[in-house]
Amino acid sequence: SGGGKEAAETFNRVESHPRPDA
């Protein structure tokens, strides 16, 4: 991840697992 992309990554990965790495 990096900067603003981190939020998008977390949002995309939440589909795979119900809890984001915040």
Swiss-Prot record:
MF (Gene Ontology): alpha-amylase inhibitor activity
Record's keyword terms, sorted: Alpha-amylase inhibitor
Region Disordered: start-end pairs: 1-22
Functional note: Inhibits insect alpha-amylases.
Protein name as annotated: Alpha-amylase inhibitor DR4
Protein's organism: Delonix regia (Royal poinciana)
Lineage: Eukaryota, Viridiplantae, Streptophyta, Embryophyta, Tracheophyta
